[in-house]
Structures are given as C-alpha cells and as structure tokens.
Amino acid sequence: KTRDEDEKLPREQPALGLLLVGERPAWIGERGDYDFYDVRGRVEAVVRALTGLLPRVAPDDTLDVDASFLHPTRRARLFLGEHPIGVLGEVHPDVAAHFDLGDRRPQYAELDVRALFAAAQIVPAPKATEPPRIPAVTRDVALLVPSATQAAALEACLREGAGGLAEEVQLFDVY
C-alpha cells in the first residue's frame, strides 16, 4: 500500500460510548430530562472505576470534525492530566432531528479506550497523606453569575481565589 491508500482507510479505534435521552428517574423532587451533568457524572464514575482518577472536563469550541455531531456550544473535552481521553455533550439538534425524539435533547459521551488507559498509566496516582490535625470543613456557597459564564471558568476562578486552602471545588447546581 502507498501512504495515500492508508490515509483513505477509515480510522478505527476502540471507544466506549454513552447516550442518555429521555426522562431521568427521580427518587425525590421534580423529574426532568437527562442533561449534560447526568452524562458527565456517569463518565466520571466510569473513568474513576477504571483508573482510580477523576477526569477533568474542559469546554472546547474547537473540537475537530470527529465531534461535529455535538452541539457547538454544549460540548466539552475530557482529560486525564493533560492527556485528552474523550468528548461529551449534547447531540447537535440537526443530528437529533433525524430521530423520533420530540423536543428531547440527547446527551452523548465517548471515551477513547486506548488514550484512557495510556493516560492512566502516565498520570501519577494520588498518594495517601497523614490525616490533618484539624479536620476539613466543607462549605456550600451559592453564587449568582452571568448566564454566559462557563462552569470551567468559574471553577478556575474559585480555585485561584482559594489559593492552597481549598482541597476541592465542585459545582453541583444550575438554576
């Protein structure tokens, strides 16, 4: 084969896909359709179960053609350390229109299996430390921010503002 013939062949790689669509079951409170945070939570659980590490979710408006089926402003990349391992987000409305979904917004995630396990071996595993003399304090803070504020930007701002005092920053609600 020539180099040109190899470039014409489809690129196949093992991937793990997840699609959520419809009404999520609710054991308390109001029911609602699956959203970005539902698929993100499941992906984080899978990656943590497989690698022991929590992936970083970063917004990305420059995803390549391979992710053109995702909504351009409702998608993100997944990383372990600095290594990309997948994408997640809302399926593009033009793509969803080809299926009988009504006004539902399908949520999709795809993990590159090879990249996931390669990154898990490169990224150092967390080390155990001695328990602190003074126990940690958990704070639940409510913030009102402009609707155009990206979750990753807000998280980065909170981490920077806390300096070394915050062990973890976790955004958990959107109103």
Task: Tell what function each PLM region has.
Residues 6-17, 24-175:
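A carboxyl-terminal module marker
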